[in-house]
């Protein structure tokens, strides 16, 4: 049973992740997307490695399972971090938060196709239809998505989908320990991001503003490093089902913070779409919990 401190941590995690989108938008004013992703992962890797050392957990990044760790690092960290930075730089930050909330929906579809024990049922179908109807409704709002930026909205959704792909791949090594898997895949994402950042973006030639640099540091230290540690604490104390409730709150914080800090326009269609996405995710999560309790 979650106590008040557990709920506080869940809301804090949602607020931190929800705030990452407007900070990505500010950071992309001065930093290229691959470099932005690289810095985030560098700051995330430090507390993860220290955590494993403290808990005496062996980091298996270069063990015989290295192919799985490297593929997950590519699909679950390097690619989505980069795609989200590309997309968020050209659309409203709260729109990126809402589009990212499709991750559990696309993940449910992929789990039905690629796993044996997470098949579709009526509740999941209803949830997916409601959620994606909300996203499609967003694309009808020409104030928010138009011919100039719709491709970047699609890129953001693609980043979200890669998170789902990474989640499916992680099931292959789910018995390897949460801290080890996260740390090992983070190390591999660094291996992928470093050469591409150096070759394609030449970060030493950038002339970043103070605002962008502060946002980048926030993304690395708080929104990635600290957030992952909070996530581990929630997982270890309250379990996966409780931790996934954070997905309800992230788009809400994304919309509110985008409006407060960037003065982004919120239309009626945006609010309707937000409600639809949250309801859709509710149906999906309820169906999953019913499956768990019936096993």
Where are these regions (language model features)?
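Hydrophobic transmembrane alpha-helices of multi-pass small-molecule transport proteins
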Residues: 48, 70, 101-102, 110, ...
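Specific transmembrane alpha-helical segments of multi-pass solute transporters/efflux pumps
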Residues: 16, 20-21, 49-100, 137, ...
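Hydrophobic/aromatic residues within transmembrane alpha-helices
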Residues: 27, 36, 40, 87, ...
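Transmembrane alpha-helical segments that form core, pore/gating elements
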Residues: 48, 107-109, 113-114, 145-201, ...
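Helix-helix packing/entry segments at the starts of transmembrane helices
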Residues: 37-39, 77, 81, 96-102, ...
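Hydrophobic/small/kink-forming positions within alpha-helical transmembrane segments
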Residues: 18, 49, 73-78, 82, ...
């Amino acid at each position: 049973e979650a106590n008040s401190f557990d709920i506080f941590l869940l809301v804090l995690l949602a607020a931190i992740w929800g705030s990452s989108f407007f900070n990505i938008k500010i950071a992309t004013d001065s930093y290229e997307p691959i470099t932005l992703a690289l810095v985030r992962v560098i700051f995330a890797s430090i507390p993860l490695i220290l955590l494993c050392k403290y808990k005496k957990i062996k980091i298996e990044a270069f063990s015989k399972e290295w192919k799985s760790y490297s593929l997950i690092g590519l699909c679950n960290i390097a690619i989505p971090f980069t795609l989200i930075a590309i997309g968020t730089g050209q659309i409203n930050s709260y729109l990126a938060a809402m589009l990212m909330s499709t991750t559990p929906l696309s993940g449910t579809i992929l789990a039905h196709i690629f796993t044996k024990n997470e098949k579709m049922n009526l509740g999941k179908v209803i949830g997916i239809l409601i959620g994606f109807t909300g996203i499609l409704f967003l694309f009808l709002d020409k104030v928010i998505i138009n011919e100039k930026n719709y491709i970047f909205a699609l890129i953001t959704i693609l980043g979200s989908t890669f998170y789902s792909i990474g989640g499916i791949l992680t099931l292959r090594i789910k018995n390897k320990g949460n801290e080890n898997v996260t740390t090992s895949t983070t190390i591999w994402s660094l291996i992928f991001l470093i050469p591409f950042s150096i070759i394609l973006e030449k970060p030493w030639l950038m002339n970043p503003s103070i605002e962008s640099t502060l946002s980048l540091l926030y993304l690395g230290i708080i929104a990635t490093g600290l957030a992952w540690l909070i996530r581990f604490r929630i997982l270890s104390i309250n379990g996966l089902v409780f931790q996934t409730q954070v997905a309800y709150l992230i788009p809400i914080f994304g919309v509110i913070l985008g409006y407060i800090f960037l003065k982004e326009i919120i239309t009626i269609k945006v609010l309707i779409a937000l409600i639809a996405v949250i309801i859709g995710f509710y149906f999906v999560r309820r169906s999953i919990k019913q499956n768990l309790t019936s096993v």
